[in-house]
Amino acid sequence: MNYILFRKSISSDHFIADFVSCTASRNQGGYSCQEAFDGSVQNSGNGWAYDGQVPAWASFKLAEETKITSLRLVSGIDRNDHRLITFKVSMHVNNRWVVPGDLRVKEDSEAIIASDGTITLSTGIHVASLSFNPISNVESVRIDVTKTDAGNNNLVLTEIIPNFADALPLSKYF
């Protein structure tokens, strides 16, 4: 059984991450970056998308500075595409962007991780669990996307979930 980590739960299918706002290079109609932290992981019509206009980015502000040791990126739920392939995650700490060290993707042992932190997955996967050296005082998390497995290079980032202390199992997708 897989677990997604978070602080506040509503039910086994919904949770609330401690993000409070976001900005993005583009928000596709009906797919605002705010939907990537609304706690809904069971709907293909929910999440952040950008009309396939890459490179694309979204930055998610946390409610308070916190220590993050892992991050889950859920994409393309109820789809056979619109999932991440090439992307980069960085954390805003003390007025600068930091790339996580010792970065790994749990579900893809063949993922290529460049020296600048850019991750290229071997195939599209619905859940990318990123582990890395702990980063303290994180204010925001940013994802830069350059490639997906969709024909139009669009993404639906269903949820972005930072590691927090409590765990709750999610149902059929994980």
Question: What does each model-found stretch correspond to?
Answer:
Residues 143-151:
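Short beta-strand-plus-loop segments that form exposed binding edges in beta-rich domains
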Residues 54-55, 63-72, 137-140:
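Extended extracellular/luminal ectodomain segments enriched in beta-structured repeat modules
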Residues 80-95:
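Short, surface-exposed beta-strand/strand-loop-strand elements in extracellular ectodomains
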Residues 68, 84-88, 102:
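Exposed beta-strand and adjacent loop surfaces of beta-rich binding modules
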Residues 95-102, 169-170:
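Surface-exposed loop/edge segments in extracytoplasmic proteins
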Residues 4, 71, 89, 160-162:
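Extracellular beta-strand elements of beta-rich domains used
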Residues 122-140:
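Short, surface-exposed tryptophan/glycine-enriched loops
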Residues 1-63, 76-82, 106-117, 121-122, ...:
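Disordered, acidic Ser/Thr/Pro-rich linker "stalks" and the adjacent N-terminal cap
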